[in-house]
Amino acid sequence: MPVYSRLPLTNSQIDYLVEPDIPSMHTLVSLPSGHKIRTHFLHPAPPSPTENEESSERDAELIIVAKSVAEADTPVIVTGDLNDVAWSETTRLFRKISGLLDPRIGRGMFNTFHTDYWFMRWPLDHLFHSDHFTLSKICRLAGFGSDHFALFTELVLETGNNVQQGGLKANEDDLAWAKDKVDDQNVSKYDVPQPETT
């Protein structure tokens, strides 16, 4: 899983949160201003007969990352090919637990998979951010040889008073469902690396 950055990455760690062969990357992105952004790059395996018969592993990975960022004071971005559509119960649960925002809401679907089939495309690639950011631009880029289109997202870090942005809130049923998913895979939010900003 390659991650390329024009900005310095520090305290980087590659980890295998749920499955021993599915990596994720956790790092701090250092801005020229000196601000640090806690960033998590994920690519859980999709539910499919050739990879995982169920979505349990993918769901657990998303939930433990959501729980790990929920109380973060620093700016946070979680991004990657999550192998899940934007409207799924699991993606909505991720948003509720993490408190992160989906910049696509109200702006379009931005279907990124599959580049070869215009009549069957799904928004599998995601970027979620904390309310430290506002959206400047979001668009799907042209194909570049992959079976996914790139999702270009330009965010602005608001260093003063943050604009109040609405996200989803988890209720007791959501939290119980998340606990069951995580317990089934024997993982927890403490398994997710939390790059320190100091």
Question: For each predicted feature, which ranges?
Answer:
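Soluble catalytic domains of enzymes that build or remodel membrane lipids, polysaccharides, and related
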Residues: 1-197
